[in-house]
Swiss-Prot record:
NCBIfam families: ftsZ. Belongs to the FtsZ family. It comes from the Bacteria. The keyword Nucleotide-binding applies. CDD domains: FtsZ_type1 (cd02201). Keywords: Cell cycle, Cell division, Cytoplasm, GTP-binding, Nucleotide-binding, Septation. GO terms for cellular component: cell division site; cytoplasm. Pfam families: FtsZ_C, Tubulin. Essential cell division protein that forms a contractile ring structure (Z ring) at the future cell division site. The regulation of the ring assembly controls the timing and the location of cell division. One of the functions of the FtsZ ring is to recruit other cell division proteins to the septum to produce a new cell wall between the dividing cells. Binds GTP and shows GTPase activity. This is Cell division protein FtsZ. One of its GO terms (biological process) is division septum assembly. GTP binds at G21, G22, G23, G24, N25, G107, T108, G109, E138, R142, N186.
Amino acid sequence: MFDFNDSMVSNAIIKVVGVGGGGGNAVQHMCEEVSDVEFFALNTDGQALSKSKVQNILQIGTNLTKGLGAGANPEIGKRAATEDRAKIEQLLEGADMVFITAGMGGGTGTGGAPVVAEVAKEMGILTVAVVTKPFPFEGPRRMKAAEQGIDELTKHVDSIITVPNEKLLSVLGKGASLIDAFNAANDVLGNAVKGVSELITKPGLINVDFADVRAVMTNMGLAMMGMGEASGENRAREAAEAAISSPLLEDINLDGAKGVIVNITAGMDMSIGEFEEVGEVIRSFISDEAIVIAGTVIDPDMSDSMKVTVVVTGIEKVAMKRGFGVEKTSSLQQSASSFSNKTSAPFLRKETEVVTGASNAPKTDSDDVNKSDIPSFLRRR
């Protein structure tokens, strides 16, 4: 069954804060690609901030570092952010949702990002972190610092999406330049922020608004964001599969996932059958008890293609890494059979009039849900 909820359209204020050098670079990259959100770069390094093209900048810990960086010391980054908690609070004032992005493993981002998150949560803001883990060539010491920083950050956010840079090497190949590798990392961070923020800010025929995002991301822990695009006769299924594959994001286990937001973008030719087909793919990999919220956006420029954005929250890390070489055909047959024999997860649909402007943010409540056995999460080749 679908729940139909009429809603008015209003603004939800979204702020994206890049902490440290990696976070600042990512935000600078994003501000050229993502609209309808406010961007901020926060750093101890005054020289790095002076070169930033981000409109809003904040230098922290000037009494501590004298305008220099944190020297790859997370403790310095933490103390610098703590020194300027009041300024950070002022920066976050008025936000409904905050994305915190950082390259973990260094000093300012690793130590400062958890402080920013803590302040945001204390202010009652929906707080989501999107961070990278170091490349293997950056060494075990940096990786250890990153892991410790991520553990600390996780304590203070509603949801966290982690991007291991090592995955980029397998996708890009060893012949890729260093610049290409870091640009690719920025692309992944940007797509994660864009994928979630556009769910809120871009009006749709069937609308996903801030209240939906809040219900699925509040106090949910580990999250995954995936985007897939396909064209042709099987575009709905193929785009949905690509979205949940997410080869660049952290290996995760969808068993017991508590919430899913699905956004489907296509042209005027999108059918209700395609809408349901995307739902089949998504529901076949999650618990019957998970909250599934779906929305659509009609883009007249997409004549033959379809894009599916999926945000999955309340998931668990995989103890051992899974390969991507799973045969997809057999998994689809199993999924189709499984789906036809079980009750669909709650599939909540928001219907709104298509207008320009941001989406509505009425309050909705979501109950805690229990984990249950479901088909294993299968990766595409």
